[in-house]
Amino acid sequence: MDELERVYQSIKNIFTHSAPSEKLVGLQNRLSISLRFIEYAFETYQPERLAMSFNGGKDCLVLFLLCIYYLKEKYKEQAQAKLSNIPFVFVRPRDEFPEMDDFVNECQSKYRLNIIKISLPMKEAFCKFLKEHKHIQAILIGIRRLDPHGLHRIAFEVTDKGWPKFMRIQPILDWSYTEIWDLLLETNTKYCSLYDRGYTSLGGVSDTSPNPALKNPDGTYSPAYLLSDGSLERAGRNNTVPFSRTNSRFLYDSGASSYASSEVS
């Protein structure tokens, strides 16, 4: 079984479980909503006009798994070719962890990805990327509400004034910290090794530390998935923001026509 098929079957098993626990039912609901966003994104832009922001963190990894599931469901044996043609943009922190770079390289090899690494500040990085990939109109982003500037985001929105123009597609906004880890563990997906050393939110070396809430009496740290209070996810980062469980204002069932009205041309 190849890696894409493994991911597809592991998510399919969540949907088809004969006696799902309360946790799995919640995960089924969360998956269903996000997959509708992803379906609309791929139907509107087609894989040829989409890119994905990917730094190897847990959130973009979950979004990536959902995209694999959709591509396998839609394109069957052609899913790998579709996936390999999508540009994955890795905006590298100035002081990145070697483990993050190693994990991105591992994903590139394992899933046969077209990863484009850019060592510039975020805005300049996307300016450079879009200048070199003029056909790209929309970018999938694994932002969640706990992230800085994530609280009032919506699933589909054009970039802010002053940024290069593209459609931001943000299908996992309302996933909780626990739900992110539930999916990664349920699908037995390999993740960046830093998470097993107590890091719960990854940035650069200078602004990221193991989460103090996971520190053990002997000075070691428990794995990230054992953090019980999701509001402490960014406790190892600067500029933490409180978590608010707010449903997206841009729900799929509000009508697909409202998406098209703000489509990037």
UniProtKB/Swiss-Prot annotation:
GO terms for cellular component: cytosol; nucleus. The lineage of its organism: Eukaryota, Fungi, Dikarya, Ascomycota, Taphrinomycotina. Pfam families: PAPS_reduct. Keywords: ATP-binding, FAD, Flavoprotein, FMN, Nucleotide-binding, Nucleotidyltransferase, Transferase. It comes from the Eukaryota. GO terms for biological process: FAD biosynthetic process; FMN metabolic process. Adenylates FMN to FAD. This is Probable FAD synthase. Belongs to the PAPS reductase family. FAD1 subfamily.
